[in-house]
Amino acid sequence: MLLCLLIAGCSTVPVQEEAGLKRATAEELASLLRQREAAIHTMKGLFSAKVRGGLIPISTRVEGAVYYRRPNAMRLRGFTPIGGELFEFVQVDDLYMLRLPTMGKVLTGRQLEMGEMGKLARPFELSVWAMGGVLGTSAIGKDETMKLVEEGPRYRLDVFGPRPGAASTDSQLLRRMWFDRRTLLVVQEERVNGSGETDASIQYEDFRSIGEQAPAATGNPDSRLLRPFKISLEDGRGQGSVQVTFHEIISNQELKNEDLGRVSGRPSPPGSAS
């Protein structure tokens, strides 16, 4: 009888959501992304990259530096472990420049055309996506829509945008972001191509504060400058993977124009780097 009472008593207890999990709407998550993007005006960092499967065929280990100025100026430099220069990648607005001194090549063009530049430009396209997790540049655009899905301890935010050349009402999936519901930080992201296939999968780990707390007016502890110091990227095309580990990240200190490099020269003809 006592056992029956205990069982009956247990059955009346409602299932509780796991302690520590936060609730949020799609709009609230989008607001957090905007706050995190606005929190960084400039950034510079030192990192190491480990490469598998020929994603960056010029080296299997790269020591690098990144410079960024909001809203859209970035420079990546890569070196061998003994200090030899491997590459310089500069992005300004919708233009880019890729210099490969060991190969005697300089490629320039528009970001949307990077896929036409062959295997050399692909790793740097992926690197820009990976760095977005540190810079907070994955904010939802004005012409993008969202769908929120609850997946246990995570939220998945699907982001849709207009399909190129299609009617304004026709949209396609652009990317997915997974938020840890304990912290509401983005811990995983997938970029999706026009065919609906995964173009790249990115994992974000080892979050640390890189600056002072954001203005108290936000009233949200997650608005602090918490950024991932470890980024793991899998190329959806099966060309390999890259793991970036930051040694140092400094935010919101003045950068000189020469720190950011420049894009010069005419765009390279498509296919010239294949």
Model feature map: region roles:
Residues 1-10:
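Sec-dependent bacterial lipoprotein signal peptides
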Residues 10-61, 264-274:
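N-terminal leader/targeting segments and the immediate start of mature chains
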Residues 35-43, 56-60, 67-72, 150, ...:
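Edge/loop elements at the starts and ends of beta-strands within beta-rich repeat scaffolds
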Residues 43-49, 62-66, 72-78, 85-87, ...:
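One face of beta-strands
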Residues 49, 72, 78-82, 93-95, ...:
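A mature extracytoplasmic/lumenal domain signature
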Residues 70-130:
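An acidic-aromatic
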Residues 109-149, 266-274:
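C-terminal low-complexity, charged extensions that often adopt amphipathic alpha-helices
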Residues 146-267:
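Gly/Pro-enriched, hydrophobic low-complexity segments
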